[in-house]
């Protein structure tokens, strides 16, 4: 799915005419700031049928105060949106303390019963152990170049991995996206969930230690396929170039890997993911 994330910088954006499967909207920052245009943006997103998320930008002012401010602000929309925590270095006095971030994730889950996504730069994924955060779905960001672009189903990422996570569920690949219906820059994202899987996060029906990972079949094109290709190649099941495209060579190598583990389906389902983790 293709989508955007917005804040007060996109005040007045008409989400009815900007093409996107989903939109993630800044709600709050710190213990008192509410993003300008938040209520209008989230109300319109829901009214025009967009899959919708909201995020809080952490600033280190105190876990309880930040989470309380976030949850009280988004309360009218709580059962309709996914929740995200934005963890960046700018205007965040606790950025070097990854345990503060993990405490915020746990506090959001405790107050809402829902599992929040964690947004951060891909490089930050590798800076800390993230013992607890790794159990929360990752929304990672990395840009190859700052040139205007539109959606792509195969965004660039480096080969350094995502630290404690195998892959992100949402990936932000540009801050200078250009889409019809809006004349200025937009953050562009790709989401590797299905619409139903997204909705399960809005309802709080996902288990913390069992993040959704998609079923992969012949013809699929995404970063999950690329990760499997890299894994197969690294473990002696050569499938050629790790291009993110699930073709015949990838399927043949996968079948050999599965046969060596007592199964053979030719696609990546939950059993294959579980075997990969074991």
What are these regions (language model features)?
Residues 81-158:
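Catalytic domains of cell-wall/extracellular-matrix polysaccharide-remodeling enzymes
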Residues 7, 203-244:
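Acidic, Ser/Thr/Pro/Gly-enriched interdomain connector segments
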Residues 27, 46, 74, 108-112, ...:
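Sec/Tat-exported extracytoplasmic proteins
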Residues 243, 265-266:
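Acidic/polar residues in short coil/turn loops that connect beta-strands
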Residues 254:
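Conserved hydrophobic/aromatic packing and binding residues within compact polymer-binding modules
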Residues 1-114:
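Substrate-binding cleft of extracellular glycoside hydrolase catalytic domains
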């Amino acid at each position: 799915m293709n989508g955007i994330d917005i804040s007060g910088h996109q005040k007045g954006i008409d989400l009815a005419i900007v093409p996107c499967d989903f939109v993630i909207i800044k709600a709050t920052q710190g213990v008192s700031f509410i993003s300008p245009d938040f209520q209008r943006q989230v109300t319109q997103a829901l009214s025009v049928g967009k899959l919708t998320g909201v995020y809080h930008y952490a600033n280190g002012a105190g876990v309880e105060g930040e989470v309380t401010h976030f949850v009280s602000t988004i309360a009218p929309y709580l059962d309709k949106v996914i929740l995200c925590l934005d963890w960046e270095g700018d205007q965040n006095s606790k950025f070097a303390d990854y345990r503060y971030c993990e405490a915020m994730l746990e506090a959001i889950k405790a107050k809402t019963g829902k599992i929040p996504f964690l947004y951060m730069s891909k490089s930050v994924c590798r800076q800390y152990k993230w013992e607890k955060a790794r159990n929360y779905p990752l929304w990672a960001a990395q840009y190859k170049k700052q040139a205007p672009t539109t959606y792509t189903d195969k965004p660039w990422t480096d080969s350094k991995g995502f630290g404690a996570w195998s892959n992100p569920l949402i990936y932000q690949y540009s801050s200078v996206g250009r889409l019809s219906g809006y004349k200025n820059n937009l953050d562009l994202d790709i989401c590797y969930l299905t619409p139903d899987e997204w909705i399960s996060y809005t309802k709080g029906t996902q288990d913390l230690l069992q993040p959704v990972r998609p079923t992969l079949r012949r013809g699929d094109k995404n970063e999950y396929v690329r990760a499997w290709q890299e894994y197969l190649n690294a473990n002696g099941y050569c499938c050629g170039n790790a291009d993110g495209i699930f073709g015949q060579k990838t399927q043949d190598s996968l079948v050999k890997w599965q046969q060596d583990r007592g199964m053979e389906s030719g696609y990546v389902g939950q059993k294959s993911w579980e075997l990969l983790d074991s």
